[in-house]
Curated annotation (Swiss-Prot):
Protein name: DNA ligase
Residue sites binding NAD(+) per the record: 34-38, 83-84, 117, 140, 177, 285, 309
Main function: DNA ligase that catalyzes the formation of phosphodiester linkages between 5'-phosphoryl and 3'-hydroxyl groups in double-stranded DNA using NAD as a coenzyme and as the energy source for the reaction. It is essential for DNA replication and repair of damaged DNA.
Origin organism lineage: Bacteria, Pseudomonadati, Pseudomonadota, Alphaproteobacteria, Candidatus Pelagibacterales
Assigned EC number: 6.5.1.2
Organism from which the protein derives: Pelagibacter ubique (strain HTCC1062)
Protein family membership: Belongs to the NAD-dependent DNA ligase family. LigA subfamily.
Positions with a binding annotation for Zn(2+): 403, 406, 427, 434
Ranges of residues in domain BRCT: 595-676
């Protein structure tokens, strides 16, 4: 084996080690036995000793040397710690601002002020203060619940333990980033892979004395909830944070206009290497807190903030092979297996090619020399092909016309919206009859946003599938734990933990349950809309009739595409069998509206025409916040038709025929105790 082949073999082992390391240390969910993990480390160390030119900062000789505790108590965040949407260019920012303008129905774009704050590449934390005292400190966790790491956070000098300022809120959840400055990291780099890993590992130590030895810093930047805080905007809040004893980012700015946001982004990107800490972009927040409240949240991110990432990292590599991956909805995704390369501190050996059309457009072939790009959390992808280096015997890649998993034909759906064929080719099966789809649907079923079964990750799903322990979702709730206990890497304690995690998740909300089924076009937001409409699990299980499914078209946001997908789902006999079994094994909670005593409780509304000073999206949001219900068709279930300027006459006439009350904007706002 020559030096180049040795290096490739070594980097593959490093890549595998990093993936296992993440599950072992960061997630506390090992996917291989301790023996296999130790053997892999030994292989890498032996290679380094024998061949001195083999080096990597991700080697086990340089990475974290202790295992964090599994004993941190999990606590639910009062207000979820949501992730942000990403922007990568000026067009993305323009779209972000356009959505804000449309939602708020603003006429002057220059009225929107932004707080621009550098995005530190660290670990998010939540600090709960009651009567000025730090009572609890939580990690972000999965966004809905975090771990109680109070004692470790108290070791950070930047975090005040008690605040006596008169204007400090009676109760507040201060949020910020824990990180290590680059110069401090140089002193401890032999123990950790990178500054972020150092911060993460240190915060999850059972012994806070170990955490205290690490030079952690904390910068505050927002709040989750508060009581009795009289502050009107984000920039004033940041100023008050400093008065209360917190450190804030010295590069925070107040900016108006996308062009100025872009100038600030360019300026900071040029300076980033000179900064004391790592940043990977800038977060823009609508400055005015009242506007933030009006904008609210989408499914899993605020509408009033976005993270503008810095330029992607890229590297040159060679495509060794092109493989087809099959997703839970049957989508066939081509993936380039490339020679492992380091891109922005991460070893990359796979890059997505997106779809068949993309391969044809770029004429991507096995053996090609390509530029691979990785930006933030985005999956690495092939940007371009160096045609000058193309091998003479290269052949065009032929996309499979049959599913590589089950042999069914592959199809491209006709898109009713674009009036064109989809770019994505799919397995015609789309059900549990296709092995790869079945595995991916089960992975989706147990995923974070669905059942969120702790310790039941993707590798466990694959292992249990190969052992024929799981074939359908209901099998998860009927596992043979005695058999699992005999498997390599499992023992009484790990099996008991898995059993507890599964039993704990038998109680689930209706929206999570609907989302877990992996119905095409039914994401989190649509699952929530359907759950709110149906209210009970029994109503969902009774959807199998075509007429019942058609009734979902009354939900604002559910269209023909979603209705067709739901019909297709309920026509599949295996899906019906899965639903029947899950109904027996689960306790699915009815939907209880947060504001169940709202001013519009049990009332249904429909909008027609243009409203004055408020967008249709915000009007719908206000109705739902006050326990009202939006429907999209005029029918006998409609209580009020809200008519703005230039309403649709057909809707007005139909409402009159059925004696439905027609009200104007002023009358509707009075119902909300608001002045028009």
């Amino acid at each position: 084996m020559n030096d180049k082949d040795l290096e490739i073999e070594y980097l593959k082992k490093i890549d595998l080690f990093q993936r296992h390391n993440k599950h072992y240390y960061d997630k506390n969910k090992p996917i291989v036995s301790d023996q296999e993990f130790d053997l892999l480390k030994k292989d890498i160390i032996d290679l380094e000793r024998k061949y001195k030119f083999l080096k990597s900062e991700y080697s086990p000789t340089k990475s974290i040397g202790f295992k964090p505790s599994k004993n941190f108590q999990k606590i639910k965040h009062k207000v979820p710690m949501l992730s942000l949407g990403n922007a990568f260019n000026e067009e993305d920012l323009k779209n972000f601002e356009k959505k804000i303008i449309n939602f708020l129905s603003l006429k002057d774009v220059n009225t929107i002020e932004y707080s621009a704050e550098p995005k530190i590449d660290g670990i998010s934390a939540s600090l709960i203060y009651i009567d000025g005292k730090l009572t609890k400190g939580l990690s972000r966790g999965d966004g809905n619940e975090g771990e109680d790491i109070t004692q470790n956070l108290k070791t950070i000098k930047d975090i005040p333990l008690e605040i006596t300022k008169s204007n400090f809120p009676k109760e507040i959840d201060i949020r910020g980033e824990v990180f290590i400055e680059n110069n401090d990291f140089k002193k401890i780099k032999d123990k950790f892979a990178n500054p972020r890993n150092a911060a993460s590992g240190s915060l999850r130590q059972k012994n806070s004395l170990i955490t205290a030895k690490i030079p952690l810093k904390f910068i505050a930047y927002t709040y989750g909830y508060e009581k009795k805080m009289n502050i009107k905007n984000q920039t004033s809040f940041l100023e008050n944070l400093k008065l209360w004893g917190f450190k804030t980012n010295p590069f925070n700015k107040k900016i108006i206009g996308v062009k100025n946001l872009m100038l600030n982004h360019k300026e900071l990107e040029e300076k980033r290497k000179e900064l004391a800490f790592d940043i990977d972009g800038i977060v823009y927040k609508v400055n005015d807190f009242d506007l933030q409240k009006r904008l609210g949240f989408a499914a899993n991110a605020p509408r009033w903030a976005i993270a503008h990432k810095f330029s992607a990292n890229s590297s040159i590599s060679e495509i060794m092979n092109i493989e087809i991956q099959i997703g839970r909805t049957g989508a066939l995704t081509p993936v380039a297996k490339i020679k492992p390369v380091n891109i922005g501190g991460v070893i990359v050996s796979n890059a997505t090619l997106h779809n068949e059309d993309e391969i044809v457009r770029k004429d991507i072939r096995v053996g090609d020399t390509v530029t691979v790009e990785r930006a933030g959390d985005v999956i690495p992808h092939v940007v371009s092909v160096d045609l000058k280096k193309r091998k003479q015997n290269s052949k065009k890649f032929i996309f499979p016309l049959k599913c590589p998993s089950c042999g069914s034909k592959t199809i491209k759906d006709y898109n009713e919206t674009t009036k064109r064929q989809d770019a994505v080719r799919r397995c015609a099966s789309e059900g549990f009859e296709c092995e790869k789809i079945a595995i991916e649907r089960i992975k989706h079923f147990v995923s974070k946003d669905a059942f969120n079964i702790d310790g039941f990750g993707k590798k466990i799903v694959e292992n249990f599938w190969n052992l024929k322990l799981v074939r359908l979702p209901q099998d998860i709730f009927k596992l043979n734990y005695n058999k699992i206990e005999e498997l390599e890497g499992w023992g009484k304690l790990s099996v008991a933990n898995l059993r507890f995690s599964i039993e704990e998740k038998k109680n689930i909300s209706l929206e999570r349950f609907i989302y877990s089924l992996g119905i095409r076009h039914i994401g989190q937001e649509n699952a929530k809309l359907i759950a709110r409409h149906l209210k009970t699990a029994s109503n969902f299980f009774r959807l199998s009739g075509e007429k019942n499914i058609e009734s979902l078209s009354n939900i604002d946001g559910i269209g023909i595409t979603q209705i067709q997908s739901i019909k297709k789902f309920f026509l599949n006999k295996t899906n019906l069998k899965v639903l029947s079994e899950l109904e027996k094994n689960l306790l699915i909670k009815d939907v209880i509206l947060i504001n169940n005593n709202g001013l519009l409780k049990n009332k249904t509304f429909m909008l027609t025409g243009k409203l004055n000073g408020i967008s249709r999206a915000e009007a719908k949001s206000l109705i739902e916040q006050n326990s009202g219900k939006i429907i999209s068709n005029v029918n006998k279930k409609l209580d009020y038709l809200i008519a703005g300027d230039k309403p649709t006459l057909k809707k007005i006439n139909t409402a009159k025929e059925w004696n439905i009350k027609i009200i104007n904007q002023t009358e509707w706002l009075k119902m909300l105790n608001k002045s028009g």
